[in-house]
Amino acid sequence: MTFRTTAVTAFAAAALLTPVLLGPAAANATPSTGVSAVTLAHTDIPAGLLPFIPQGAHVEVREITIAPGGTTGWHYHDAQIYGLVRQGTLTHPGADCKPVVYRAGQIIEEPGGKANTHEGTNLGTVPVILDVLYVMPPGKPLSEDADAPACAQP
């Protein structure tokens, strides 16, 4: 199975679980502003249960809302994640500070690792709403705070 097939399968399995409300993640290096998140579903896949995830995984689906003028702050993920922009326009610069713009209906694929530090910003007038699928290594957080890259320093 491909990772994409695995992710879709995990998304479907996680979507069947009971919703749990979580608050916004705290950021230390470059704090988020105007961001809230609701966990729609989550589960843990034990090591050895699925051959395509031999180490196991924490699977979580979250609805993330970024208010107009809000930002996630600079961060990265320890594994590739997938998102769907349900509403609004997300400006998404990476470590090279070149913004990529995602509009409603578009899919975001974010590679994992510190080298893929990025931020999400809402420069529009309506909230950005994202549905994000995380398939994370056991014990890893959904995101890791990061310093803004040199190109983003004022």
Regions found by a protein language model. Give the residues of each.
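A short, N-terminal "cap"/entry segment at the start of jelly-roll beta-barrel domains
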Residues: 2-11, 15-58, 146-154
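Extracytoplasmic
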Residues: 56-61, 125-128
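Short acidic-glycine-tyrosine-enriched beta hairpin
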Residues: 66-67, 94-115
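Short histidine-centered beta-strand/loop micro-motifs
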Residues: 72-77, 94, 101, 119-122
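Ligand-binding loop in jelly-roll beta-barrel domains
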Residues: 98, 113-140
